[in-house]
């Protein structure tokens, strides 16, 4: 199945503690989860590793979020939108369902 949400897409969170926030997808995991910049931040206790030059402490990092809890953001309408697929000139392209514009 083709991916409706891909890397570098701007998404908006529909459910959870970060509901309503927007961010850019930095990674799509094969388990159906996404890592979105600035969303679902968790504190990780990092053990120091002098061989790699890593300082210890508590660091904040993005945790994966379920893909069903986000929707692609349509900048033309300023709202969350659904994505469809169609063929144009032999190429399969994604488009927004609300206004039929192509996803960039």
Swiss-Prot record:
Keywords: Ribonucleoprotein, Ribosomal protein, RNA-binding, rRNA-binding. One of its GO terms (cellular component) is ribonucleoprotein complex. It comes from the Bacteria. InterPro entries: KOW, Rib_uL2_dom2, Ribosomal_uL24, Ribosomal_uL24_KOW, Translation_prot_SH3-like_sf. GO terms for molecular function: rRNA binding; structural constituent of ribosome. One of its GO terms (biological process) is translation. Signal peptide: none annotated. Part of the 50S ribosomal subunit. One of two assembly initiator proteins, it binds directly to the 5'-end of the 23S rRNA, where it nucleates assembly of the 50S subunit. One of the proteins that surrounds the polypeptide exit tunnel on the outside of the subunit. Belongs to the universal ribosomal protein uL24 family. This is Large ribosomal subunit protein uL24. It comes from Shewanella sediminis (strain HAW-EB3). The lineage of its organism: Bacteria, Pseudomonadati, Pseudomonadota, Gammaproteobacteria, Alteromonadales.
């Amino acid at each position: 199945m083709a991916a409706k949400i891909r890397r570098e897409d701007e998404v908006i969170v529909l459910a959870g503690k970060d509901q309503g926030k927007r961010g850019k997808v930095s990674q799509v995991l094969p388990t159906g989860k996404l890592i979105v910049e600035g969303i679902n931040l968790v504190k990780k206790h990092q053990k120091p590793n002098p061989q790699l030059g890593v300082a210890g402490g508590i660091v904040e990092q993005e945790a994966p979020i379920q893909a069903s809890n986000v929707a692609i953001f349509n900048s033309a309408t300023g709202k969350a939108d659904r994505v469809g697929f169609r063929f144009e000139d032999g190429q399969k392209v994604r488009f927004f369902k609300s206004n039929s514009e192509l996803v960039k």
